[in-house]
């Protein structure tokens, strides 16, 4: 086997060696890591192998938990009791100090367990209160930290496999303290020139320690000096611990180079590798010989048995008992100081740190010293070696000097520690057996009494044994191996220690096939072996120091009488300077301020982003003003005369809007940027006007208080501009004959004194409720309470009167409508141009409670325009035109004339040109007046054709389904009737001659003999509950009902996110003990890791909410029933908001982590981050700024926080409205965001990267969706028509691109060029697929749609610029195309869900009008809305459908729900007037439609039942509902109930909005 390995080595290194080297290296070169020193077990003795016990382990749990208090005494107490003693007692055998430190050097060559284990475990030593060294202030809370050593992870699993520590160096006597324990370490020590080890500037010294050579570099406990400067590169990590150990390392360094130089002279053809290997094997052999045959006998006073050859079955592994015995015994012989002398026996003085001179080097002040002033030259090192050779060590007993006991280099934050107490803890960490068990296991005689441990000690100092026995409760079986072995030692190691040490060295020698005496390994010849055996340490010293042999005694490990250079005296602590005291290190010292500034800076990121956004907003506002000035110069030449620009303050929660104030005679006009009039204020005497000016903040605010109006607050850029406005106002008020008062207030008080439009509307709403409660007998609780505030502002608001414009707006009509003019003029009794509450109340009383005569008289007075008591034909025509205007209908003048002539002729007034009130009342009574009252009927005369056509309805109400009370129904005498019609406010049947199944046959003079099935459409009205609790419960139920899909999806999403958080949090809290990080930062790591998992999930899947093409596709699948794809943007915002909150928590967790990492010692950090830190004993961790700015996760994390702060601030509602371009540009930082996220987690600082697990799939889908969007061309479109409709709806009609095909019900994305070419918003197309243009109805519900409405406001003249163009992208979404597959279809639209049906209705009518083959014969459209005010634009489309529906295909029903809850003026007027005015021309007053407007909820089940009666031949009816989930759920429930019957099947299809 040896031959084969030698051959393999030769083949491996041969090609790279010089020819001479290949010929000279004839042996198998020994590895540096200890492998293959034993061919039986290759790993024995290798670096990293476990320690091999001589005695079974003794742990508390039998596995790994060490024994401790109270079972065993406190280590510090035991150290003080059994091992404290005075210094200055010489060795009984005259052993020298050189032998002591040579023993430490040999021990460093054989074993090293100083590296802490991972995860970090601590066996801290509690210091008894009042300890003179460590607790002089008697605090009682001092703890000396002790970290357990590294162990084999394959051990410590069970009592049969207890924990075993690992050896960090080779377990062979192979010179690893000289050459290192690995090939790479050795390479760092070599110079690769002449076979020598690398030296520094001085050839006598090696080069200094540096990376990647990880020398042990703790701070100097005496001075606090840190770093590798002044420390040399040795094979042993702790070779620089003391100058004395360092001197021995320098000795062997110089000896190797001396051998290499000698070999180079003898063999000039050898190369570097050959010289190095020959010198190395010679040095190792010499080191083995000196250790085994010179030092060991001097240490044990025993010679090992003769070497008999290599024994492959002998396990040479180091035992923990050997480590404890040897190290502990060495410590008893360490003196308090060490002499230095030259070759002429001159013991020189030593320079201390304070420049004083002392007899010797103080040991306690020499630990880890750097650039020692007494060891600057090679001669100084020689002097130290000579001094140690002549100095007698301390006595070999149980006592230890204070330099070792109290002032040993301390770990972690302590500069000092008790070495003996630490050794005791180390023994417990090793699981060492008790003293008695060890003796028994090693075959030594048992000890049964404390005095038998050391009879000599019992006689001379029995108090020590007694005190020790007391600490162990007189139980000898508890006595530990270390104190027991020390107590039995006196002059020589006791029997236990001697047996352990001798056994270990014999096994090391006999189990090593590379031992220099093994003649079979080919290393040395017999002659060379004999030469090596004859080489002593004295020979080495003489060779290296170039001194004469007479300067040293023959055996440098002893000094006997007559030997050269005796020491002056046995050193004691009195002869030496005091030890530097204990220093508590503060790792965070000096970092508090910077750490706080860093955290404050991170917290200021949002503020900086806010400041940036504010600057951008200001720049945008300034540019906007500049553009306004430029535009107005060309557009408003005439208009600017007497006008001034300003900002109107609308309230604290409302944004200021730029306006133009134009003063005219008797009026103040407030206009927007396109000169559309926003408000007109009438100036009529005798009003008292108050003018309030601000006195601070630049004196640029003005408040105009005019009675009967809400206040006008204007803000100017400069005080001068305000002054000009004040002067103009004063002139205008004087011209109008108005008196005014002027005073000043602070701007804040001025704002509080202003009555805003919103405040007035709230006050008037409550007041209106009380008015209607009196008229309609509504419960006062439903009407609401009047404000209790009695301030001047409230009193002024309650005395306000409605202007003509406000009156029209409250009715939802245009101010110029004739109906508004007529009613306003009639109600304005005092003629002051305003309508008081009492005046309006009088009108309401007549409408609601007046008799038919009173109501007809009111109508007569309304339309008696000239007030002469007569209504002419022209005035009658104007009356009809007023109703037509209300209906937004367009009838020609000829048609109106025909209607009037027919009505006059039927009443017998064909010869009259004017009507008195009696004539007017008779005409209405005889013809259509019945339609205005509750109990009237039409008699004897056929309805005129024009009225018949207008009266044709698509809805019928079955009297069988209604309560036939006398108040709501009336029957005329049948003998006088040709056609009987039931006419009530709730049910109406009009004759029609279309649609054969519904035809009613009319015969003059005959009754209706055939029964016609009628459709039940009566609304189901629910009592509105005013109880706050009931409202809250109902609101919650409706919320859950309407958003059940949203709630379900959110529940799933946040359950996953929460599960990820909990999984990571649980893992790091309870399952990551092997990492040890939770012991360092429990809260911080749980918070940061848990949030990191959730953030990874959220930031990944948030991309799916922006995959518009995918969402468009999925909306057309069954998934749309479970996932609200239309809420993707809202979901995007919600995820983003949650993610930013978690990001803040994640950052907070890492702030805690950084702080704790900054105060954690390097030994702990090297366990937590083995790829980032190497424990070199320096203890000091990296500063906080290193974690923040010099690590990849830290730096990317800071950058991510900055990017997120920018993105989130600019994405907020306010700044998105101020500068959408800023939002768009900053939101494109998401690319950099995801790049940094990937980099942030890829460093694997705490755990392996996991972000890609969540990110990969959504990213691929998102990229694919983006590519689809990029492949689709966006078309630029010109706007053909723009119209501002009531309730903030803007109607845009624009060109249809060539090849643009879509289905009714689909939607598009548009971008207005004036608002930015990159901001797209989705809207449903309200045009039909057959139309040449595309149309949208856009409600101003947000900042973008509001600005769109302003941009497309109607121009004031023909010279204004054309409308801005649009970008069109689409179409998207689901087309509701299934309706045409049913002979009868029911379309149910609720809320915004009516939008897709607008296109469908128009499409159906068109196909019918062009005789297109359409299977569908009848469509019932049910429009359910909270108030029709929100969707007046749909009424226009329905009106268009009605007028084009010549085949009576569409039947429309409108249901307005929750009247009492809404209860505003307009809805209340609708409730009062609808039943009276909808009968005029058979149209609704407010919708302008022929359909009846119902108040309540649609009765779906009765409606579907009656539908079966109306269409008995239809076996399958399609029901399509679109709107809130609550409505579609009711439709579904009704369909299911009807489908239980064996009749018509109702197939329900729904889509929720």
UniProtKB/Swiss-Prot annotation:
| Reactions catalysed, as given in the entry | NADH + O2 + H(+) = H2O2 + NAD(+); NADPH + O2 + H(+) = H2O2 + NADP(+)
Chain positions covered by the region annotation Interaction with TXNDC11: 956-1250
State the compartments where it is located.
Apical cell membrane
The SS bond pairs are: none
Q: How does it sit in the membrane?
A: Multi-pass membrane protein
PROSITE patterns this protein is in? EF_HAND_1, EF_HAND_2, FAD_FR, PEROXIDASE_3
The EF-hand domain extends over 815-850, 851-886, 895-930
Binding site residues for Ca(2+) 2: 864, 866, 868, 875
Gene3D superfamilies named among the record's database cross-references: EF-hand, Haem peroxidase domain superfamily, animal type, Nucleotide-binding domain of ferredoxin-NADP reductase (FNR) module, Translation factors
Occurrences of domain Ferric oxidoreductase (ranges)? 1089-1271
Listed EC numbers:
1.11.1.-, 1.6.3.1
Residues with an annotated glycan are: 94, 342, 354, 534
Top-level lineage group: Eukaryota
Q: Which GO terms describe its molecular function?
A: calcium ion binding; heme binding; NADH oxidase H202-forming activity; NADPH oxidase H202-forming activity; peroxidase activity; superoxide-generating NAD(P)H oxidase activity
The UniProt annotation places Ca(2+) 1 binding at: 828, 830, 832, 834, 839
For this chain, the Swiss-Prot or TrEMBL PTM comment says: N-glycosylated.
Instruction: Tell me which family the UniProt entry assigns to this protein.
Output: In the N-terminal section; belongs to the peroxidase family.
Q: Which proteins does it associate with, and in what oligomeric form?
A: Interacts with TXNDC11, TPO and CYBA.
What's the protein name? Dual oxidase 1
